[in-house]
Amino acid sequence: MHLQSRLTALRRYPASTNQETQHMPKFSTLEIDKDLQNPRVARLLLNRPERLNAISEDMPGEIRAAVEWANADDEVHVILIEGAGKGFCGGYDLAGYAEQHIEHPCQQEKTPWDPMVDYACMKRYTEDFMTLWKSAKPTIAKVHGAAVAGGSDIALCCDLLVMAEDARIGYMPTRVWGCPTTAMWTFRLGPMRAKQMMFTGDVIDGRTAAEWGLATMAVPAQELDAAAMTLASRIAGVPRSHLAMHKMVVNQVMLNMGVEQTQMMATVFDGITRHNPEGLWFRRHAQEHGFKSAIEWRDSGRPIPEGDEARALIREIDARAGGRS
């Protein structure tokens, strides 16, 4: 997201913490407001339902701005994050990037890949998501449908996770063309389960997430909103200072374990996965056959072309594309 866009988003609400003068912010990718029944709960709605709430360039910075707004309001004690429409968040809005020949810090076609420009872009998004984790006020992700790929980054940066039993969570791009930059899986699941998720790119449902300890609870879909609000309201009865102190103590353990250093490595590796032979093959396949075909191959369990095989396939695809031009 461009700096000017982020500054514009931050200017949409005043810096004052006076509740009478602080207005509800307006965003292009999400909404935030206080719950009508319990104004101690701020409800942050990812609001791109026509794209399964996919992450656009504006969304990470708007999440940061919304969290900062909620933290500045003394009435708010807890932030509940949810998605409009059929699911929580389907990940980054990548179809256009994968299928088209465009110049972007995270996809450079005509010029050599600049890893530091790529890193700066993705690190900014990661830091935006991490405002949910760093927020002085507890954050709860309420997940229905799917929280996958980058959507799982948003969910796992929240302090607590409440899922519908049939909802799904996972990071499929670990098979090719991605590495979760927030690196939260190990801290939320432990090394063995995290490795299983990263090695397979599989998704799990809400029931399994609760059994594994990834989700705080999993409930039938029709009970999800009530369960999430019951938990949020229970938390909202605790003084803000106590919530902030307890959160700081737990977060400090993760900081001592190296969460920030791990995120730096994961963000570097994410850029590499998009520009190594395997990542370039994935993108060329999407450009020739469409993004849907590419992700169907990725998720099918078929071996991903690698190394020299991937390079040879890239040359073949480029030759066919040259013949059609």
Where are these regions (language model features)?
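Conserved CoA-thioester-binding segment of acyl-CoA-metabolizing enzymes
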Residues: Q4-A84, G322-S325
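C-terminal alpha-helix plus adjacent terminal tail
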Residues: L7-L10, N18-R40, D205-G206, A226, ...
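Terminal peptide-recognition signature
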Residues: L44, R48, E62-I63, I81, ...
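Charged catalytic carboxylate motif
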Residues: D58-E62, R124, T131, A227, ...
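Glycine- (often His-adjacent) and acidic-residue-rich active-site loop
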Residues: G83-E127, G290-S293
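Short, active-site-adjacent cap segments at secondary-structure transitions
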Residues: K86-C89, V148, V250-V253
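Crotonase-fold acyl-CoA enzyme core
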Residues: M130-L243
